[in-house]
């Protein structure tokens, strides 16, 4: 299974999964149809699935156009998103598994950003390989999504699930927010040497207009404050030893950053 990033809107990524041997493809969170159409035609592959993480327009905006051109494809989304994702046919919940090109993805229910958000995780095939996590707007590189429909407690529970995955997991989040997220992270975790180093690297990448996605989960665990709600440094900064309260205060600060 090959994975490509497709740029969309101002800072979105659509992820194209494809198998050159079987000539089939799937897309994760298609915001716009044209980038997908162009790449499918260039690769000469058939679109068989849309994997949606949640219902927001910048994640499902291309669903209907893709269905119109590829009417046989299957649209996957969360069970709680029934009626909110265009063309949805399969309604997934925690513990479900979905197949693409001989690979099976595990489904995680990760409410917080929305009440129905899900994530897809393809475990590694061989020892030493990376797992692939498609997490929409739940976990960002250096950050996490705003809480539009969920609570801090729900988001901490959701991020705990994702944090428990192996360090050697590639994080395919749906927006290029890394540099701004790390700028914020430095305001709440200024003495974190790993974070300081990562910020310098990301700043250089973005100056050269290079993408920072996928991120690596092991790096996120060391540098992303929204995966470090239980670290002593952040507990001190947020003046709380209660993880959900630490997270809520972090999120409140980020919302106003």
Curated annotation (Swiss-Prot):
SMART domains: Lactamase_B. Zn(2+) 2 binds at residues 58-59, 137, 175. InterPro entries: Clx_II_MBL, Glyoxalase_II_hydrolase, HAGH_C, Hydroxyacylglutathione_Hdrlase, Metallo-B-lactamas, RibonucZ/Hydroxyglut_hydro. Pathway: Secondary metabolite metabolism; methylglyoxal degradation; (R)-lactate from methylglyoxal: step 2/2. Disulfide bonds: none annotated. GO terms for biological process: methylglyoxal catabolic process to D-lactate via S-lactoyl-glutathione. It catalyses: an S-(2-hydroxyacyl)glutathione + H2O = a 2-hydroxy carboxylate + glutathione + H(+). GO terms for molecular function: hydroxyacylglutathione hydrolase activity; metal ion binding. The keyword Calcium does not apply. Keywords: Hydrolase, Metal-binding, Zinc. CDD domains: hydroxyacylglutathione_hydrolase_MBL-fold. Thiolesterase that catalyzes the hydrolysis of S-D-lactoyl-glutathione to form glutathione and D-lactic acid. PANTHER family: HYDROXYACYLGLUTATHIONE HYDROLASE, HYDROXYACYLGLUTATHIONE HYDROLASE GLOB. Belongs to the metallo-beta-lactamase superfamily. Glyoxalase II family. This is Hydroxyacylglutathione hydrolase. The lineage of its organism: Bacteria, Bacillati, Cyanobacteriota, Cyanophyceae, Oscillatoriophycideae. The gene is gloB.
């Amino acid at each position: 299974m090959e994975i490509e990033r497709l740029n969309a809107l101002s800072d979105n990524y659509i992820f194209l999964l494809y198998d050159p041997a079987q000539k089939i493809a799937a897309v994760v969170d298609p915001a716009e149809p044209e980038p997908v159409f162009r790449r499918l035609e260039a690769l000469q592959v058939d679109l068989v699935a849309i994997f949606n993480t949640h219902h927001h327009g910048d994640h499902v905006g291309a669903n209907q156009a893709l269905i119109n051109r590829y009417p046989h494809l299957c649209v996957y989304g969360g069970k709680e998103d029934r009626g909110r994702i265009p063309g949805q046919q399969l309604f997934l919940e925690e513990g479900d598994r979905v197949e693409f090109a001989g690979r099976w993805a595990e489904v995680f229910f990760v409410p917080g950003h929305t009440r129905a958000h899900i994530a897809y995780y393809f475990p590694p095939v061989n020892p030493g390989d990376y797992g692939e996590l498609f997490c929409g707007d739940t976990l960002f590189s250096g950050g996490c999504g705003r809480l539009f429909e969920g609570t801090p407690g729900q988001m901490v529970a959701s991020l705990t699930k994702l944090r428990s995955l192996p360090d050697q997991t590639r994080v395919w989040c749906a927006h290029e927010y890394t540099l701004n997220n790390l700028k914020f992270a430095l305001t709440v975790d200024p003495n974190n040497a790993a974070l300081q180093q990562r910020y310098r690297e990301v700043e250089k990448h973005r100056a050269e207009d290079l993408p920072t996605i996928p991120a690596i989960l092991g790096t996120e665990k060391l540098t992303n404050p929204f995966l470090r709600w239980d670290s002593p440094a952040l507990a001190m900064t947020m003046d709380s030893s209660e993880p959900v309260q630490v997270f809520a205060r972090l999120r409140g600060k980020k919302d106003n950053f």
